[in-house]
């Protein structure tokens, strides 16, 4: 890992809050091209599921056992570590779910998604067949019970059940909208000032991109970034847990990686990566302050985002469009959303 990248990732957590995050993750002075890729395909019909293979490759097979030392002549081999797999493979397991409107990978340790992938188009957002009032938060029975985030974990926790794929992005179908309410699509998020405010404005920005681009793909997920302890000047990863007993991790930050496609075969893709702290953010804070090098998100998350896209097809999103939010009060936004049903 380069010293520059370490500094970017570490410094983003050195001081809590939006200002420090934005300052440390800033692209100012960084002329490197964003290193990501996303295959450009014709926008599917709104009701069609998005295959995981469009964004991420299939997980690699379990590694083969290392060669063992030669056994003594005429005797049994000394050890057989892979014999343990007769009783079960320990993992880790990433629960991959393909929904009608998104694909997600679930982290059994934190009880949050690793990532969620969605695809929005002008056509998909123009249909209002889903009614949020008919959707309910539900536990995901596809996740083994002992690894599952539960409704009671969020009860009186002080955190919102924060959608990673927004319900408003899947309003073209009631079933698709309902699937966004699985707890496997949620993370604990600060409510006032973030989930109900700045984060919601950010989601709206993503939807508004479809006025300029015919196809927009978005990867969203949590981060758990280190912070320097002033007592000993060392770096620690520290985050709250909710639930009784503690069960669900509270992310320190959230990322979005945006692929805005021009719709042409082999055409350009405008890429934008953003990291926001899980904290109250003033509505007058410029969105572009949270723009980061994509490599920083990859280093911090341990993920790679579509590395098959040639460099010559990549454009910087915020150089191609106005990266800014439009502020709407929560009550006004909910009322407006309800009228569209």
Per-segment meaning from a language model:
Residues 2-341:
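Domain-level detector for secreted/extracellular nuclease and nuclease-toxin modules, and
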């Amino acid at each position: 890992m380069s010293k520059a990248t370490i500094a970017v990732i570490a410094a983003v957590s050195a001081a809590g809050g939006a200002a420090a995050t934005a300052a440390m993750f800033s692209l100012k002075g960084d002329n490197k091209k964003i290193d990501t890729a996303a295959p450009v395909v014709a926008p599917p019909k709104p009701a069609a599921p998005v295959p995981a293979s469009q964004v991420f490759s299939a997980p690699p097979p379990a590694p083969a056992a290392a060669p063992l030392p030669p056994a003594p002549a005429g005797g049994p081999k000394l050890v057989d570590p892979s014999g343990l797999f007769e009783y079960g493979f320990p993992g880790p397991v990433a629960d991959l779910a393909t929904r009608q409107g998104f694909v997600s990978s679930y982290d059994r340790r934190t009880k949050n998604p690793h990532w969620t992938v969605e695809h929005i188009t002008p056509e998909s957002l123009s249909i209002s067949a889903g009614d949020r009032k008919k959707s309910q938060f539900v536990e995901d029975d596809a996740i083994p019970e002992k690894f599952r985030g539960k409704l009671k974990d969020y009860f009186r926790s002080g955190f919102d059940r924060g959608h990673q794929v927004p319900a408003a992005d899947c309003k073209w179908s009631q079933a698709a909208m309902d699937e966004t309410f699985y707890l496997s699509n949620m993370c604990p998020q600060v409510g006032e000032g973030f989930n109900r405010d700045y984060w919601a404005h950010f989601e709206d920005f993503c939807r508004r991109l479809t006025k300029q681009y015919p196809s927009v793909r978005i990867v969203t997920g949590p981060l758990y970034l280190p912070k320097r302890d002033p007592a000993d000047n060392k770096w620690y990863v520290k985050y709250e847990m909710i639930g009784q007993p503690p069960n669900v991790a509270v992310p320190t930050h959230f990322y979005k990686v945006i692929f805005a496609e021009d719709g042409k075969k082999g055409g350009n893709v405008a890429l934008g990566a953003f990291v926001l702290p899980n904290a109250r953010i003033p509505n007058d804070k410029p969105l572009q302050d949270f723009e980061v090098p994509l490599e920083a998100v990859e280093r911090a998350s341990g993920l790679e985002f579509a590395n098959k896209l040639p460099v010559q097809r990549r454009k910087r999103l915020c150089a191609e469009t106005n990266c800014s939010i439009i502020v709407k009060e929560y009550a006004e936004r909910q009322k407006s959303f309800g009228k569209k049903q």
